[in-house]
Regions:
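Stable alpha-helical elements in mature extracytoplasmic
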Residues: 1-2, 21, 71-81, 111-114, ...
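Active-site surface patch of divalent metal-dependent phosphodiester/phosphate bond hydrolases
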Residues: 1-36
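Loop/turn elements at helix/coil->beta-strand transitions in domains of secreted/extracellular proteins
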Residues: 8-13, 31, 50-56, 95-100
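Active-site-proximal beta-strand/loop segments in catalytic clefts of secreted hydrolases
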Residues: 15-21, 25-28, 58-63, 102-107, ...
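Metal-dependent phosphoester-hydrolase catalytic domains
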Residues: 35-38, 87-101, 107-254
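A shared catalytic/ligand-binding motif for oxyanion handling
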Residues: 53-61, 69-75, 162
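A long, amphipathic alpha-helix that forms part
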Residues: 68-94
């Protein structure tokens, strides 16, 4: 069905699904996936030989609302996964310099420590998830992509006029800037987009009537090309979608 919705030619999409609500679809083969993380789904994407390494991408849909302790545990668990990936042994090991990308609906409505943990590797429950460690290969924190809306001076990624919650930045993209270069990042919002722009882009005004994360990272000199989209139209129906406009990978989730 995905090949019908978004045809890319060739062998079509490579797809893996976790046991919760996330799907990762890639133009390139998916070497391995790790569905064991709590509400987080990691996959190693086999990039073409023009890239120095493959890409380790993790989609996330963390617990909502007042579940701060659960979200913190999930963030701690992802940091543990990254530390494992960057060192020999364990459940996953990737070569030095492999681009690491973490993106999705983090439901970040509670304590700021959760985002701090994802960015810096500052684990809160060390007894369970092990020691802290830097997230990027060069010993620095992950980079957080700022994604202002395309057609409004706003940066929130979620809004509901019928909800008690205010508009908020709930969806995020973190990446290792030692291995990937950010070229563009923005949040797609079609309901206020000019008709001529909609026509050029092949969009309709209702496609993202709620803000939709469209975050684009493009690399140079063999560095990783990364793209992620969270579709507002699907999100308004209780789903979310990540899309690479150039066809590298697609992420679907709740």
């Amino acid at each position: 069905r995905l090949d019908t919705w978004l045809p890319i030619g060739g062998t079509g999409w490579y797809v893996v699904k976790d046991d919760f609500d996330m799907v990762i679809a890639s133009k390139w083969p998916i070497v391995q996936s790790w569905p064991s993380l709590s509400r987080q789904f990691a996959a190693l994407i086999d990039l073409p030989s023009t890239y120095a390494t493959d890409l380790l991408f993790t989609a996330a849909h963390l617990n909502c609302c007042t579940a701060d302790a659960t979200r913190q545990n999930q963030c701690d668990e992802y940091v543990q996964f990254v530390q494992d990936a960057k060192s020999p042994g364990g459940q996953v090991t990737v070569p030095n310099g492999t681009p690491l990308v973490y993106a999705g609906d983090l439901n970040s409505v509670g304590f700021a420590q959760q985002l701090t943990t994802l960015r810096t590797g500052d684990i809160q429950n060390n007894a369970t998830y092990g020691p802290d460690g830097p997230m990027d290969w060069d010993g620095t924190p992950f980079t957080h992509a700022d994604c202002p809306q395309t057609d409004a001076r706003m940066a929130y990624t979620w809004r509901s006029n019928s909800s008690a919650y205010p508009s908020g930045l709930l969806d995020h993209l973190f990446f290792s800037d030692a291995a990937a270069t950010l070229a563009k990042s923005f949040t797609l919002r079609t309901d206020v987009m000019a008709p001529v722009a909609l026509s050029v882009l092949g969009l309709q005004s209702g496609d993202a009537d709620k803000p939709a994360n469209l975050q684009q990272d493009a690399g140079t000199a063999g560095r990783a090309n990364l793209r992620f989209l969270k579709s507002g139209r699907l999100r308004s129906q209780g789903s979310s979608c990540g899309l690479d406009p150039s066809g590298m990978f697609l992420v679907l989730g709740g």
